[in-house]
Amino acid sequence: AGPAVTSIERAGVVTGTRFEDAWATYCRIGGLVPENHNAVPAIQTVSILNAMESTLRDARMNFSDVVRTWFYNRDITAWYDQFNRVRNRFFDARGVFQCRVPASTGVGGGDVGGPALTAGLLAVRPKNGLVRIEAVDSPLQCPATNYGSAFSRAVEIAYPDHTRVLVSGTASISPRGHTEHADDVAAQVDRTIDVVGALLASRDLSWDDVTNGLAYIKRIEDAGAVTNRFERKRIEGLPLMIVNADICRDDLLFELEVNAISPRARYNHGLG
C-alpha cells in the first residue's frame, strides 16, 4: 500500500493533498482561484498567492517548502509584467528570494468561472538532512530573475537513493533574456530542446530519465512541427502531452516543462 493521503479543503472544496514517505512530507495543491473574479488582475493575483499560503498553512507548511508552481493566466500577454511585479513583491515579503525560488510554469489558461488566473503548487519538506533541495541554473540561459520573473530554471530534489529534477516551463530565450527565433516554431523548439537537455545534463540526467512532459503551443497547427523536431533530435518515446495555450510573450510560440527521475544518487549521504 502507498502512503496515507490527507485531503486539504478550502471553502469546502478539496484543493490539495498532503502525504509523506520515509524522506519527506509533500503537499500538492491545484485549481486555486481568486475570491473575486471581477477584481482587477493584480488584486486577483494577490488573492491567489494568499490562497496558496493559507492552504500551505493548513498542511503545516509554508512558502519556503514550495519547489514548483503553476500559473494559468487568462490573456497572459496583456498583463504578464503586472503579474510578475505582484509575485515579486509577495516573494520578497516572504523571504523566498533569500531561500529558494521555486521552479514554475506561467502560460495562458483559465477557469470556466472567468477569473484572471488559476494556480497550483508542489511543496516538499524533508524530514532530515538526507534530502537536498536546490535551485538549478541553466547552462544556456540567464536566471529568469534577471528579467523580472520569479522562478528558477529547475529544482533538483536529491534523495539518498534517487534524484528528481523538475524543469520549469522553458522557451527559446537567449542568455541575455531575449526571445530567440521570433515567430519560427521549428527553431524555437530546437532551441528549447537544447536548453532543457543541457539542464538535465548539468544534473547527470538525460532525456531517457524524463518521466513526463508538457509542451505548450500558441498555435494548434504547430503540433506536427513539434513532434517532427523531437524526432529529428532523435528523442523518441518521450511521454509528452501537447497543449494549445498562449505563451507569456507575443513572439514565443512554444514552451516545454518536464519532470525527470534518475535511480542514481548524486550525493554521498553517509548511508550504508
Report each predicted region and the residues it spans.
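N-terminal presequence-like segments and the immediate start of the first folded domain
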Residues: 1-272
